[in-house]
Amino acid sequence: MSEVAAANGSPSPAPTPEVPATELAQLALEDEPKVSFSDQFKAFSKFGDSKSDGKLITLSQSDKWMKQAKVIDKKITTTDTGIHFKKFKAMKISLSDYNKFLDDLAKTKKVELSEIKQKLASCGAPGVVSVSAGKAAAAVDRLTDTSKYTGSHKERFDASGKGKGIAGRRNVVDGSGYVSGYQHKDTYDNAH
């Protein structure tokens, strides 16, 4: 390629230095769009309220936001947020009032306001953070284990635990003189 460029009279392009993979990964993280505090305020003020326009936030929405951002902990509790929020004497407050609310909360609890705002801005979109899969209770395991069934219910399943279908549910009269489900039929004569 450099011979072609030299023949055309144009200078050859400078070789590009190799960039390590760690630097590329860091650059990729920097290229992600940063969500601002006001954008997060708008998103959380709409969270759980389909009629909201994103300009006012309630105490419960604020608490959800703070819990997701891990601002609410042992130092700052929902009681503290409730006390400071109620100072505004309104059910919903605007972004400017919310900034005053955070400033008052940070001063009272001796926490850096910038740290709180940084956590709130970088907590991600509103939603359920982690949902654990349902776990069967011990009672459910005990009740659904066919090997522990007794009486006539035991006859409804084969050795592997699979149901026998209609044959396991229907009482068929056999006329032998034994009750249904009796397993030692015709063994009395062998024992005596």
Swiss-Prot record:
It holds the Pfam family p25-alpha. Residues 1-20, 151-192 are annotated as: Disordered. InterPro entries: EF-hand-dom_pair, TPP/p25. Disruption phenotype: Embryonic nervous system defects characterized by cell misplacement and errors in axonal extension and targeting. Neurons display defective axonal extension. Defects are probably caused by impaired microtubule organization and integrity. During larval neuromuscular junction (NMJ) synaptic development, larvae show reduced synaptic growth and transmission. Severed axons of class IV dendritic arborization (da) neurons display decreased axon regeneration, due at least in part, to impaired axon microtubule integrity. Futsch expression in adult heads is reduced. Keywords: Cell projection, Cytoplasm, Cytoskeleton, Synapse. Highly expressed in adult head (at protein level). GO terms for cellular component: axon; cytoplasm; cytoskeleton; neuromuscular junction; neuronal cell body; presynapse. One of its GO terms (biological process) is regulation of synaptic assembly at neuromuscular junction. One of its GO terms (molecular function) is tubulin binding. Residues 152-161, 183-192 have a biased composition (Basic and acidic residues). It is found in: Cytoplasm, Cytoskeleton; Cell projection, Axon; Presynapse. Belongs to the TPPP family. PANTHER family: P25 ALPHA-RELATED, TUBULIN POLYMERIZATION-PROMOTING PROTEIN HOMOLOG. Found in a complex with tubulin and Futsch. Regulator of microtubules required for axonal extension during embryonic development and axon regeneration following injury. Promotes microtubule bundling and polymerization. Together with futsch, required for neuromuscular junction (NMJ) bouton growth by regulating synaptic microtubules. Function with futsch in maintaining microtubule stability and dynamics, is essential for promoting axon regeneration in response to peripheral (PNS) and central nervous system (CNS) injury. This is Tubulin polymerization-promoting protein homolog. It comes from Drosophila melanogaster (Fruit fly). The lineage of its organism: Eukaryota, Metazoa, Ecdysozoa, Arthropoda, Hexapoda.
